[in-house]
Amino acid sequence: MASTKKDTHITNLAALEKAANGEIVTLPGWTEEQPFVARLKRASLTGMIRAGKIPNPLIAAAQKLYEGSGKSRANATFEETAKVMRLVVEEALAEPTMEQLKAAGLDLTEEQADQIYLYAIKGAKVLEA
């Protein structure tokens, strides 16, 4: 929530740049013994649309995710919605990248992808709940 306070200081640009680089997050691993630790960044559906990272045929699915499935009038299939979610996950995964995981023969589990998506849209606090 935005607020106005007299004792508030303007955020240092270096701090913003550091935050934009993402943070290290521990995720479920491919096995229970070894967690998957990755650097994740926040993502913006509207920013991805403006940057052309979400193709036009998937805009309705992005709208549905943005507005919430119960509120949205956008007509999108489950497959289209899953594709948009995967694009957000790829955007959020800073280190290793999705390309690096694929090159290593790895694909994210549903649990990993879901947690990365939640982090990308809502931040680290949602993973702590």
Can you say where each PLM-predicted feature lies in the sequence?
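Low-complexity, intrinsically disordered short peptide segments enriched in small/polar/basic residues
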Residues: D7, Q34, T46, A51, ...
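Acidic, aromatic-enriched beta-alpha/helix-loop junctions
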Residues: L45-K83
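Polar/charged alpha-helical tracts
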Residues: T11-G22, P57-E67, K83, E99-A103, ...
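Amphipathic protein-protein interaction modules
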Residues: N75-A103, D107
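C-terminal charged interaction modules
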Residues: T4-K6, E95-A129
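Hydrophobic beta-strand residues in large extracellular and virion-surface proteins
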Residues: V25, A38-L40, V89, I116, ...
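Short, charged/polar N-terminal "headpieces" of proteins
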Residues: M1-A60, A129
